[in-house]
Amino acid sequence: MATRFAQAVDGAPLDRPPVWMMRQAGRYLPEYREIREEYSFLEAISTPEIAAEITLQPYERFDPDGVVMYSDILTVLEPLGFDYHLESGVGPVVENPVDSAADTERPHGDVREELWYVGELIERLTAAVDESTAVLGFAGGPFTLSAYVCEGQSSRTFMSLRRLRAEQPAAFERLLDAFTEILIEYVEYQEDAGADVIQLFDTYAGLLSPADYREFVLPRHRRIFEAIDIPTIVFARNMAGNLDLLADSGADVVGLDWTVDIETAREELGDTPVQGNLDPALLYGEPSEVKARTQKLIEAAGDHGHILNLGHGVDRNTPVENVAAFFEAAHEYAD
């Protein structure tokens, strides 16, 4: 386990926090766009040598404390029999979404066999980075994945799944359970392949009421995190005021989106480490302002139990020099 990450998870005082960035590998880098001229997104994530090259591009540029595998939260749809593709301007589109309660009965295939390329990618990454760099695996959360397969694509409200919860609660829970079971296998697979940290992205769980999150999602999060023996991070958007629910999930670290005041979060969560939470839009400012805002965030978070990150993924059009300024701000904070 990478030392700086381990110390942050343990709550030890640090001269600076470990730093990485959600969507760290990807579209804002010109070298990434060159690769994508030859490979589609799905081809790139399912070809380990290409996915490893993409993952390592920001590692070579910015020297982050963690590299997050280049993959997608929807990869686990395949073993459950869902097909999807990407549409320009739309994003992921599920080709056979849930249309009835019967569609929530999902026997699944062999995760390690069907997603063999994920394990090989992690093995390549652990061999490529130095011992002080954490290799981060990840997975989508059961609510977010269920939302995608019910709606068929991204949505502001994911009303199809929320309606299923109201009209056919047994089918709703059956779908959540199907994803929970496969996610347990998937994160165990990533851990066995050599991942140092696992982040669970249940990004849209904040659409639920606190009572529904507590009843339907929290027990399933706990099951997933109980299956993992390495450090874990949970992330969901729009959870300000309900951070205690994320802290109860069993994850070691609570990820914060940019709408949360980090000082308030530290007070509410006590000794629970946090991750985040610079607004990704701030990376469109001048590099000097990016540095200033990043270092202000580091100061507000305190000298222990903090992993520096954005409050969500870096935007595709973010200037590369501003991404560099974000990482430089962290590295220079220790000087």
Tell me the role of every PLM-derived stretch.
Residues M1-S88, R124, A128, L218, ...:
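N-terminal basic, low-complexity leaders that serve as flexible interaction/assembly modules and, when applicable
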Residues S40-F41, V98-S100, D261, D279:
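Short, solvent-exposed coil/turn linker segments
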Residues L42-S46, E105-L115, E173, P280-Y284:
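The substrate-binding groove and active-site-proximal loops of carbohydrate-active enzymes
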Residues I73-V76, G91-P92, S100, P142-T144:
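A short acidic, glycine/proline-enriched capping/turn motif at secondary-structure boundaries
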Residues F82-H85, G91-P92, R266-T272:
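Glycine/serine-rich loop-strand microenvironments at binding/catalytic pocket rims
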Residues H85-V98, S155-R162:
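A charged helix-plus-loop insertion that forms the helical arch/lid used to bind
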Residues G89-A128:
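A gly/proline- and charged-residue-enriched helix-loop-helix capping module
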Residues Y117, L121-D335:
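Active-site loop segments of alpha/beta catalytic cores
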